[in-house]
UniProtKB/Swiss-Prot annotation:
Gene induction: Expressed in both exponential and stationary phase in rich medium; expression is higher in stationary phase (at protein level).
Taxonomy, superkingdom: Bacteria
Gene: ybiE
The protein, known as: Protein YbiE
Amino acid sequence: MRLSANRQGNTCAGRSVNA
């Protein structure tokens, strides 16, 4: 999940997109 968030450049946004 952290890797995906890192790619997006946002922690909260990355988590939302992942979910």
